[in-house]
Amino acid sequence: MVMEYLVLEKRLKRLREVLEKRQKDLIVFADNVKNEHNFSAIVRTCDAVGVLYLYYYHAEGKKAKINEGITQGSHKWVFIEKVDNPVQKLLEFKNRGFQIVATWLSKESVNFREVDYTKPTVLVVGNELQGVSPEIVEIADKKIVIPMYGMAQSLNVSVATGIILYEAQRQREEKGMYSRPSLSEEEIQKILKKWAYEDVIKERKRTLSTS
């Protein structure tokens, strides 16, 4: 019992450390990303960078499939929400002061490094073939590209998401945004209780199944 308490206390400390570095104003929106491997890789990168919220839209209304072999459990620590009207949702974020940054290849697009990701940001990445929908591009504040010097004009969507998010992380680290929680203490406690409960319940079920 004492050992179980010590393990739980250590786990809670780790969960809190993670929450204190979560960036609640750096959000990812996956627009019709259909491949579960790509989507799962995006989830894992979100967790690694400190993204707390990942929204997605599926043109066929399907729920996103998670490949746990790829996420390695990281999907438990990112809030993943399905959206039925992507434009409406993104406009809601704009009204809250977020900049909408969409990956899009055009003459108006800028190098992804030229964007200030320390501002409240929603990064929109698109479908593997068509990219981000024109309706979303129209309302985007920034359209970005990753410089390419080979024959291919684009990267895999999960790779591109990772590159952009790590630039956002670099900028935010330089500004000290990972050194202070973006979540309030009330928000931390609320999420911590949810995470801890789900984590402990799953661990106990695993222990019982192997005993």
Curated annotation (Swiss-Prot):
Belongs to the class IV-like SAM-binding methyltransferase superfamily. RNA methyltransferase TrmH family. GO terms for biological process: tRNA guanine ribose methylation. S-adenosyl-L-methionine binds at residues 103, 146, 155. It comes from the Bacteria. This is tRNA (guanosine(18)-2'-O)-methyltransferase. It comes from Aquifex aeolicus (strain VF5). Its EC number is 2.1.1.34. Keywords: Methyltransferase, RNA-binding, S-adenosyl-L-methionine, Transferase, tRNA processing, tRNA-binding. The gene is trmH. It holds the Pfam family SpoU_methylase.
